[in-house]
Amino acid sequence: MEPLIGMGVLALIGVAATIAGASEDLESDVGSQSNPNSQVQLAPQMMFPHRIFNKAVSGEPPSNALMCSVGAAVATVLISEFTLSPLFALVLGALIAACVHGTFAVTSTMGRAASQSRFKQPVYLDMIRSHTPVIMGYSFITTFCILVVSYLMTVVLGHPFPLTMLAFIWGITVGAIGSSTGDVHYGAEREFQQFEFGSGLNASNSGNIVRYGESGVRNGYDNSWFCAKFGGPVTGMAFGMTVFLGSWVTTVFDPAVSISRGWISVVAGVIIVLILIFWNWKIEVKARNAYGPYKEDKTEEASA
C-alpha cells in the first residue's frame, strides 16, 4: 500500500474513533452507566428519589464490547452470505446492535426502579420513553464508528484479526476510556454540584446527588448537555489518539517490510508513551500549583 493512502485511511480511522469515543461517553451520561451510577442507585435508599435514567446494564467495557460484537457479527453475515454492500451491512449491524442495547437499557432501568419501590422510587414511564431513543441513537453512532474502524483495519490495512474480534476489542477499549475519562466529569462534577469543588465526597453525603436542574427536575438530558461541553470531547480525543497513534507507528514503520522497521515501530511506540506520561505529569503539576490543595473553611477548622 502506498504510504499516502495508508495515512489517509489512518486519518479516517482516527476521525471515526474520535466520534465513537464522544458518543460513547454521552450515551453513558444519558443512561447513567458505569462508576457514577452507584450514587444514582444509592440515592433512593438514602431517601433521595430522582428522575435519572438508571440503567447500568454492566460496566461500560463489556456493554460496548457486546454492542459492537453484535453489530460486527450481523455485518459479517450480511457481507459474506448475502453479498450486501459493506456500507449498508455496517449500518444494519449498528442498527440491530442499538436495538439490542436499547432493550437491555429498558429492562435494566425498570428492574432497578422496581426493586427500589420500598424506598418510594417511582418508575417514570415518560422518562423511559424519552430517554431510550436517545440512548439507542448514541449507541448506533458508537457502534457504526467502531465498525468502520474495524472494517478499514481488516480490509484496507490488512489486520490479521477478523471484523468481529476487532470490534470486540475496540468496544472494550472505548468503554474503558469512557469509564475512566468522561465519567469523571459526570460523577465528580455534575452529580455533586451542591458541594464545593475539590472537597471530596463525605460518606454522609453518599447518594445525595443533584436532583433539580436549571429548570425543573434534572434528568439524563441535562447530564448529557453538561458533559458534552468537556467529558464527551475529551473521551473522543483520548480514544481517537489511542487508535490513531497505535496504528500510526506500524503504518509509517511497516514491520512487513523488514525486521528492523518492526523494531523501529516498537521504539517509536515507547517514545510516544513516554512523551504522553511526561505531558500528563506536567499538566498535573501545573494544576496543583495553580489551584493548590483543598483548604478547610473557618467553621470546619473551629470544629476540628
From Swiss-Prot:
Q: GO annotations under biological process?
A: methanogenesis, from carbon dioxide; methylation; one-carbon metabolic process
Instruction: Write one Pfam family the protein is assigned to.
Output: MtrE
What Enzyme Commission number does this protein have?
7.2.1.4
Return the InterPro entries for the record: MeTrfase_E
Coiled-coil boundaries: none
Q: Record's GO cellular component, any one? A: cytoplasm
- Lineage, top-rank taxon, reads Archaea
Compartment(s) of residence: Cell membrane
Q: Which family does it belong to?
A: Belongs to the MtrE family.
Q: What does this protein do?
A: Part of a complex that catalyzes the formation of methyl-coenzyme M and tetrahydromethanopterin from coenzyme M and methyl-tetrahydromethanopterin. This is an energy-conserving, sodium-ion translocating step.
> Protein name, please?
Tetrahydromethanopterin S-methyltransferase subunit E
**Gene that this sequence comes from:** mtrE
